[in-house]
Amino acid sequence: MAKVVAFSSNKGGVLKTSLSVNVAGVLAAHDKHTLIIDMDNQGNVATSFGKDPDDIDFTIYDLLTDVDSLKRVNDAIYNVAPNLDMIVANDDMAYFEIDVLTDPKSYPDYFDLLKRVVQKVEKEYEFIIIDTPPAMGLIAANIFNAVQDVVIPFQPEQYAFRSLVKTIAAINKFNENNPDLRVADVVPTKVRDTNLHRAFLDAAKNYTKTQNIPFSQCEIRDTVKYGEMTARLSIPITLIDGVTKTLAPYKMVFENLVKELGYIK
């Protein structure tokens, strides 16, 4: 059975997709058969691999909203690298909550829609990575009901600290529905060497300590370099061979994070 991991925060722009695709890249490079499921209507997982999500007709939305589509779930799975597949999201996911909540007869178990998809494919993979939208609605509930581990990206700023607290609270509430759910790590992202950032990092570390939640030693620095290379080469940095001396430290951060999580040795 696959280990199912979500990168989740109700704040946007904190590198959820970058973490998702690069952690998946590390796992794939270590011969771990991995699937990325995109649950965000922006479709950034697909674009990370040079694909236009609007060119893909059969997506996670179809698998979530049409039980018959699960019979051909393999048609929604796209191979993007050795040991690495993805299921794409696009703008259709923007209508997911409205479509489901306005049709309760068709979706009586509306918290279980993603879990149903995961159960269909989990025997084929060692890891399933889920990229999430910056919201705490029905999509987040489906994600929390389907995963074991949640990794929370934390940008050390005022609004992000508030978001961290609320995300942890939402996960704690959902433990009744999913006893296997846990916050596996909080990962600092977009970190700069300023007193303000260090103050918010210290505050976040102190808060997570009170919640018995790990706070990562791996910091994702505030830089555009690896984002630019991903965009130029249409592949996450952890899947790029022969990176430059400038980019090698960023690749190593993701490698160390996956080791810290205990997913590889």
Residue map of PLM features:
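P-loop NTP-binding core
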Residues: M1-K265
